[in-house]
């Protein structure tokens, strides 16, 4: 599974990258900002994009808006945020975001559950 990680916090990005690449078949390419990730997309999305909401320059939701027309059933775009705000999550959903993960102690488990299509199993256990 080809994953683009868009995260400006180098340490946090390395944590996510190392954790996810322990799973066979996962490759993670890290981008420090939305502009670089958008340039890499170049009309074709990777299998998954994990995008921090708060980035320097273009925000994660702005990046989502720019790539939304490219998203197909086989693609996933997961927004990450340290902010646990119901109104913000509702605004993401209204814009079409299907997957949102809070940066907390379960972030890796949440991401893996989404990547494996087991969100419901993870959420309701």
Task: Specify the residue positions occupied by each region the protein language model found.
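Conserved acidic carboxylate
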Residues: 7
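Two-component/phosphorelay signaling modules centered on CheY-like receiver
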Residues: 10-29
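Acidic, metal-coordinating helix/loop segments flanking the phosphotransfer/catalytic sites
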Residues: 30-48
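Acidic catalytic/metal-coordinating carboxylates
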Residues: 33, 59-62
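Active-site residues of response regulator receiver
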Residues: 52
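The feature encodes the CheY-like receiver
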Residues: 56, 85
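Short amphipathic alpha-helix used as the core "switch/output" element in two-component signaling
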Residues: 61-73
């Amino acid at each position: 599974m080809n994953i683009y990680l868009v995260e400006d916090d180098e340490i946090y990005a390395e944590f996510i990258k190392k954790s996810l690449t322990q799973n066979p078949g996962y490759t993670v390419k890290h981008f420090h900002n939305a502009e670089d990730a958008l340039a890499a997309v170049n009309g074709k999305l990777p299998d998954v994009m994990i995008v921090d909401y708060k980035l320097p320059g273009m925000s994660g939701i702005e990046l989502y808006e720019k790539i939304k027309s490219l998203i197909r059933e086989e693609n996933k775009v997961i927004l990450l945020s340290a902010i646990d705000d119901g109104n913000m999550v509702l605004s993401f959903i209204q814009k079409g975001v299907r997957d949102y993960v809070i940066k907390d102690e379960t972030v890796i488990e949440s991401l893996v559950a989404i990547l494996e299509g087991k969100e419901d199993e993870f959420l309701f256990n």
